[in-house]
Swiss-Prot record:
It is a single-pass membrane protein. Keywords: Chloroplast, Electron transport, Heme, Iron, Membrane, Metal-binding, Photosynthesis, Plastid, Signal, Thylakoid, Transmembrane, Transmembrane helix, Transport. This is Cytochrome f. Gene3D superfamilies: 2.40.50.100, Cytochrome f large domain, Single helix bin. It is found in: Plastid, Chloroplast thylakoid membrane. GO terms for biological process: photosynthesis. It comes from Porphyra purpurea. The gene is petA. Its cofactor is heme. InterPro entries: Cyt-f_TM, Cyt_f, Cyt_f_lg_dom, Cyt_f_lg_dom_sf, Rudment_hybrid_motif. Belongs to the cytochrome f family.
Length: 320
């Protein structure tokens, strides 16, 4: 008993440390490293999936990228299973960070499960599944939506595949659950977004000219970034600020047009969504199917034996 109590205490301590490190990562590291934050959606939207089927992460991560989901076709009630979200991207990709420097990409994901499905508790995980999901802090989208799970930001180089341990409901105990085929929706993003929840643009955007005219001077700032001095076609001076880290593709003396791209597109990330289906299978139905197949095979065997017997009788009668 003392050994079990000690193990439980150690597990709780590890969980608490993981939670604390995740919070510190969000508060301290994240603003400079990545905006792959499902937490932004949690703060701004009651549900991450709009009526149109669009997942709200796409409102900030404007580039479209692929995401894959792997889940079993069918599961039994009160069973733990894996759902794998794959977020691929180029190994050599480096993104522009909030301070203008270059860094690796972080990833985040949201999994929208059917009602009744939820994150599997730690005491239901197998040793193998515990090993696969260690150092991952997966949480419900809200206290009222335990079927919606989010994770992120986490380093993308080690987490291109994120395993979600899921517990299926038991219709015998949960009257809201039924043996049925259900959809699972998933969204996954890599890298920083282009728009903050406030509506402001990040520095991870293509910069367009704010006026038509001639570039008189490109002034480099000490803390990074530029000021592009444009003499507009109306002979007025327009000074356009360029955030740190953005690479210009125009030069002094060049004539530009309004809304013309004057920088390279720094974004190497993006968001994608996908879906699959899963069947909550009744054990009684499986037993019934097994019994049906057994009876069918048995009937076939008796039919063949009866046919053989009939053929022998016919052959004997012909000999007489």
């Amino acid at each position: 008993m003392k050994l079990n109590s000690l193990i439980n205490l150690i597990q709780k301590s590890i969980y608490s440390c993981t939670l604390l490190l995740t919070i510190l990562n969000i508060i301290c590291i994240a603003p400079n490293s990545s905006n792959a934050f499902p937490i932004y959606a949690q703060q701004a939207y009651e549900s991450p999936r709009e009526a149109t089927g669009r997942i709200v992460c796409a409102n900030c991560h404007l580039a479209q990228k692929p995401v894959e989901i792997e889940a079993p076709q069918a599961v039994l009630p009160n069973t733990v299973f894996e759902t794998v979200v794959k977020i691929p991207y180029d190994n050599n990709a480096k993104q522009i960070l909030g301070n203008g420097s270059k860094g690796g990409l972080n990833v985040g994901a949201v999994v929208i499960l059917p009602e009744g499905f939820k994150l599997a508790p730690a005491n239901r995980l197998s040793p193998e599944l515990k090993e696969k999901t260690k150092n991952l802090y997966i949480q419900p989208y809200s206290t009222k939506q335990s079927n919606i799970l989010v994770i992120g930001p986490i380093p993308g180089d080690k987490n291109r595949e994120i395993i979600f341990p899921i517990l299926s409901p038991d219709p015998a105990k949960d009257k809201q659950a039924h043996f049925f085929k259900y959809p699972i929706y998933v969204g996954g993003n890599r890298g920083r977004g282009q728009i903050y929840p406030t509506g402001d643009k990040s520095n991870n955007n293509l910069i367009s000219a704010s006026a038509s005219g001639k570039i008189n001077k490109i002034e480099a700032l000490e803390k990074g970034g530029f000021i592009v001095h444009i003499t507009s076609t109306k002979d007025s001076e327009v000074n356009q600020s360029i955030p740190a880290g953005v690479e210009l593709k125009v030069r002094e003396g060049e004539t530009i047009q309004l809304d013309q791209a004057i920088s390279k597109d720094p974004n190497v990330g993006g968001f994608g969504q996908n879906e699959t289906e899963i069947v909550l299978q009744s054990p009684n139905r499986i037993k019934g199917m097994i019994a049906f197949f057994f009876v069918s095979v048995l009937a076939q065997i008796f039919f063949v034996l009866k046919k053989k017997q009939f053929e022998k009788v016919q052959a004997a009668e012909m000999n007489f």
